Amino acid sequence: MDRTVQQTDYDALSCRMAAITRGYLPSQKQIEQCGYEGYTEVHVEYCNVLRRLSRRLYSRVQKACTTLLPVMNYGSFVRTVSVDVELHKYVAGFGGRAQVVNLGCGSDLRMCMLLERYPELHYVDVDFAETVKMKREVLMQSAELCRRIGASSTSPQEQDCVLHGPRYRLLAGDLRDTGALLELLQKHTDADLPTVVITECVLCYLPREAAQALIREVCGFYKSGSWISYDPIGGGQREDRFGSIMQSNLREFRQLELPTLMEFNSKEKYSARFPAPSNIQTMWEYYMTDISEDEKRKLKTLQFLDEVEELEILLSHYVILVTSW
C-alpha cells in the first residue's frame, strides 16, 4: 500500500506537466498575485533531470502530457492555483517571515518560487523516505534548482533530513507515525514562527485515527498558523455515487484505498475534522467565483471541453480548506 500511495506523486507531477504543456499553468493568478517567475522552466528542468535518473518515471510523465483529457487539465489548474494563492496570501501577510511545512510533499516545486521571492522564508518538505531521496537526487543534479532553494553539492545529508539547506529542508517521515513526525518537526522547524501547513491530497490516504492525530498534534505544536488542505470528498447526497465509484476504481485498478472518503463526504463533515473554524470551497465553487472571466475565456481556447456538466461533477467532489489558529 505504501508504494502505491507513493506512486500517486507521479500522477500529480504528470498532471502538472500536462497542464503546463497545454498552457493552463502558470495562471494569471500565479504570475500576478503570487509573483511566480520561471514556473515553467523550473518544472521542465526537474523533468529533464528526472529523465536522466529514471526513464521509466519520465516516460510516465511525458505520456500524460499528450493523453490527459481537458476535464483533467481543468482540475489540475484549479487545484494548483487555489493552493498557490492561499499559500501566498499567508506568506505575504507576514512579509515572508514565516515557514511552510508541506506534509506529503512529493515532487511539489513551490519552494523554488517562494524561497527565491522571500529571502526570510523557511520551507520544509516531508514525505516517505523513498520519495524524498529521489527528490533530493533530482534537485542536487540541477544547478538552477539548487540555486533557487539555496542548496549546494556540499549541503549536508542526515538519516531523516536528506537535504539540509539554510532555509530549505527535505525530511523523510511517515505521516502515520505522529510521534516520530513531531520529533522531526521539533528538530527542524521553529514552533514560534508563523507556520502554514499544506496537505494536498494527503489526508484522504491516511487511516482516520492517523489523520486526526496528525491534525491535532501539528496544530498543537505551532503557536500560530494556518492549514491548507486539498482533498476529494465522496459526496453527501443519497443519489451521489461519485465517491463509491471512485473508491471501487482505485481499489480495483490501482490497489489504492481512501479510508475516509465516504466518512468526510461533504464540506461540513470535512471541515469538522479541524479544531478551528475553517473556510472551505469545492473546486467548482472556486472555479465559478475566484477565476476571472478573462482566465475562463483563455482556458476555453486551450482545449475543447465537451461536457461542462462533467467538469462540474468532478470539481464538486474536491475541496480546498483553509483554517487558522
Swiss-Prot record:
EC number(s) per entry: 2.1.1.233
InterPro entries the record matches: LCMT1 (IPR016651), Ppm1/Ppm2/Tcmp (IPR007213), SAM-dependent_MTases_sf (IPR029063)
Keywords per UniProt: Methyltransferase, S-adenosyl-L-methionine, Transferase
Enzyme class: transferase
Residues annotated to bind S-adenosyl-L-methionine: R79, G104, D127, D174, L175, E200
PANTHER family: LEUCINE CARBOXYL METHYLTRANSFERASE, LEUCINE CARBOXYL METHYLTRANSFERASE 1
Protein name: Leucine carboxyl methyltransferase 1
